[in-house]
Amino acid sequence: MYILVDDENRENEGDLVFNASDVNSKKINFMAKYGRGLICLTLNKNQANRLGLTFMAPVNQSRNQTSFTVSIEAKKGITTGISAKDRSRTIKVATKKNVSKKDIVSPGHVFPIISRDGGVLVRAGHTEASVDIAKPVSYTHLTLPTICSV
């Protein structure tokens, strides 16, 4: 897990970041306890399409154009969805290569954000930066970061 900071002229904030393939309840609990921000899962367009996710708002009017989708939860294997264990399970399910929209439900307690193709060269956001950093790392499945504002 690391802290990713942006330019002081943008948001001037940091995000806790780790790769979703390494998710566990301890890391989610750390983010919730110390980051105290919204726990988000960055997805590329392909993974978001597999999950059948739609944007949270039909017209994005936020200052930084963050591409939030509807919130999600694993369809099976969770209780209320809010616990660190449940959110960890949701992230594991959502980042599987063979996932489909049948595996998740909305609304939920994990907030996906779709990264823009082209990374930080297209949008200088934490979402794209975390994906760009994860790309060279060789994992057995998708390299999709989990982020939480600090």
Model feature map: region roles:
Residues N24-S83:
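Glycine-rich, N-terminal phosphate-binding loop and its surrounding beta-alpha-beta segment
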